[in-house]
C-alpha cells in the first residue's frame, strides 16, 4: 500500500501523485429535470464544517490522524472553504518582491522552511447518498494553498501542489459502506512555492469548494474547440 512521504513536499522535481488528468469543468446531471432544477443526484458538495488541527510545522503536526480509529471529535471546527488565516490560525501576510519566508529562516533555493511552515490537518465524515452508490466516485478540490496530501478511510490517495488549479482524485478503491473518513493535510509552503511568488497576500488552506462526483458509465469528461481557416483568411 502506498504511503505519504513528507520528502515529496520538499522535492522540487515532484508536484503530484495520483491526480486525475485535468479536464473541462462542468456539472453532470442524471436527467433533463435535474438540469432544469440545477440539482444533480450525481454530486455531493462537502462544504461546511470540518474538524481541524493547526501546527506550526510538519514535526508538530498530529501523526496518524488519518487513521479510521483516530478520534478527532475534540478538534476545532473550521469552515470549508476558507483560508485558515481568516479562521483565527496564523496571520495573513503580504509580500511583493520578497519570498514570504525571507527574514524568518535561511532557506536554500528549491527547499522549504522547516521551523515555521504551518500544517493544517482536516477531517470530514460523509455518507454517499443512494443515487451515488455503486458508481465510480471522484473528489475535486477547486483550490488548496499550496500543497495537500489526501487519505480516505486511512488509505493514502494522493498528493498535489498548484494552489489555484482544481485537482481531482479517484476515491473508488477506498470507499466503504456507510460513513467514510476523509483526511487532508495542507502545507502552507512547498517546493512549488518558489514559483508561486507574486505580488499578493499569502494564505493557506482549503479555500475553494470540495465536491464528490459519481461518474456514470457513459459521460462527457472533456471538450475542445478547434478553429479551421479557409484559404488565406
Question: Which residues does each predicted region cover?
Answer:
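Accessory beta-strand-rich segments of carbohydrate-active enzymes
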Residues: 2-21, 28, 33-37, 51-55, ...
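Aromatic- and acidic-residue-enriched carbohydrate-binding clefts of CAZyme catalytic domains
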Residues: 95, 100-105
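Short, solvent-exposed loop/linker segments at the N-terminal edge
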Residues: 227-233
Amino acid at each position: 500500500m502506498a504511503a505519504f512521504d513528507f520528502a515529496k513536499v520538499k522535492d522540487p522535481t515532484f508536484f503530484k501523485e495520483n491526480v486525475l488528468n485535468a479536464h473541462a469543468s462542468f456539472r453532470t446531471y442524471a436527467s433533463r429535470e435535474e438540469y432544469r432544477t440545477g440539482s444533480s443526484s450525481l454530486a455531493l458538495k462537502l462544504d461546511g464544517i470540518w474538524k481541524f488541527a493547526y501546527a506550526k510545522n510538519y514535526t508538530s503536526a498530529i501523526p496518524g490522524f488519518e487513521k479510521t480509529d483516530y478520534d478527532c471529535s475534540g478538534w476545532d471546527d473550521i469552515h470549508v472553504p476558507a483560508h485558515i488565516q481568516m479562521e483565527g490560525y496564523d496571520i495573513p501576510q503580504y509580500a511583493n518582491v520578497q519570498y514570504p519566508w525571507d527574514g524568518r529562516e535561511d532557506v536554500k533555493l528549491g527547499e522549504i522552511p522547516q521551523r515555521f511552515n504551518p500544517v493544517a490537518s482536516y477531517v470530514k465524515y460523509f455518507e454517499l447518498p443512494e443515487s451515488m452508490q455503486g458508481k465510480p466516485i471522484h473528489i475535486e478540490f477547486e483550490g488548496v494553498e499550496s500543497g495537500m496530501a489526501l487519505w480516505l478511510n486511512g488509505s493514502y490517495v494522493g498528493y498535489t501542489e498548484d494552489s489555484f488549479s482544481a485537482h481531482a482524485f479517484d476515491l473508488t478503491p477506498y470507499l466503504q459502506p456507510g460513513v467514510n473518513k476523509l483526511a487532508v493535510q495542507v502545507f502552507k509552503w512547498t517546493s512549488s512555492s518558489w514559483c508561486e511568488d507574486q505580488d499578493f497576500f499569502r494564505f493557506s488552506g482549503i479555500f475553494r469548494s470540495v465536491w464528490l462526483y459519481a461518474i456514470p458509465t457513459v459521460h462527457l469528461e472533456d471538450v475542445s474547440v478547434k478553429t479551421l481557416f479557409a484559404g488565406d483568411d
